[in-house]
Amino acid sequence: MSTDTKAAQLANEYFQVKRHGDMAVLVPSPEVEHLPDTTINTAAQMVLAPLKEDPPTNLIVDLTGVRYFGSAFIAFLLRCHLPVKQQGGELVLAGVNDRVRELLKTTALDTLWALYTTRQEAMDALGGSD
């Protein structure tokens, strides 16, 4: 199996991307918190490729199933942020639990991204619907 095929499988297994017009919702699986950094980076490249080709105006990252994450996932979020910002849009986080909220506050990333309790709240704030 080629490296690209493995990367695509990882991306499909650990990340779902759903388009809603010019808005996208990225849903990492709960298992993403247990992945080694190199695996997150590999899967992230596959997830980001279509987003870079056709950047959404706004991107919601729904963290509902994710209890915590490390620096590799933060780097992934930052890489997702750039193409969206270049389009004049926003990356926002939904389904943020208290532990993740505290991590984002400690790193001051809560000032970069708006945090919402639910995906629907985020979609409403960005002018979309589910």
Q: Predicted segment positions?
A:
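Amphipathic alpha-helical interaction surfaces in cytosolic regulatory modules
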Residues: 32-113
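General small-molecule cofactor/ligand-binding pocket signal
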Residues: 18, 94, 116
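Short, solvent-exposed secondary-structure boundary motifs
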Residues: 1-11
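Short acidic-hydrophobic, aromatic-tinged amphipathic segments that line or gate anion-handling sites
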Residues: 112-118, 122
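Generic signature of intrinsically disordered, low-complexity, basic-rich segments
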Residues: 3, 68-71, 121
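A short, charged, amphipathic alpha-helix used as a generic interaction element across diverse proteins
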Residues: 126-130
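Residues that form or immediately flank small-molecule/cofactor binding pockets and catalytic motifs
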Residues: 22, 98, 120
